[in-house]
Amino acid sequence: TGMVERRKGGESGVKWLQAYRGDAFWQALSDGVWSRELMDAGLSRSHTLSQARPGFNNVFPTVGEMKQLCKDPVAYVYEHIDGLQSTMLMMSGLVEDFNFAAHIKGRDEPLSTQMYLPMPAARTTLANFFSPLVNNVEKMFLTGKPTYPVERTLLTSGLVIAGVDSMHQGQVKIETSHLEAVQYQ
């Protein structure tokens, strides 16, 4: 949400969300439910992309190799009121970091970046996201102004609930009329 809310016109609200897990994930990828070009652009920014082949190499994995590395992938696809489609992919076993890719009007190539979130090594401890949150709460108390749009919390919470509902109901499309009015710049 943080990246796409900065587009011209800002956040416009969300119409629907659908989850895909396991075999449904791979079928949706094959069917073009989300952009393979953008997925690859995001994966190419990863600092933790697993190598599918032994040896000293840096070969981008094929879909078949991704399936071997990523046993339980999850995708959440949702459409904004202005028609923008967003997809969040969770591909544990293939990547351990947070990456973003988008088509930008006027650019031939996708924009992609890594969102560096300092994560500890696997199975050691939890990342400390609480201290930055408390810092932002403190700034809000001191200035009387939130450090980010509070509507973002409403939108992301609503998307999480819709994602859980979609998964629980058999990966169906969930209409999110309650999120259509969540608009901000």
Task: Label each PLM-derived region with a short phrase.
Residues T156:
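Short acidic/histidine-centered micro-motifs embedded in hydrophobic/aromatic stretches
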Residues T153, G170:
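Hydrophobic, well-ordered secondary-structure elements that form the walls
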Residues T1-T124, N128-E151, V160-V164, S177-Q185:
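Contiguous beta-strand/loop segments that form the cofactor/metal-binding neighborhood of enzyme cores
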Residues I174:
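Hinge/cleft segment of the Venus flytrap/periplasmic-binding protein
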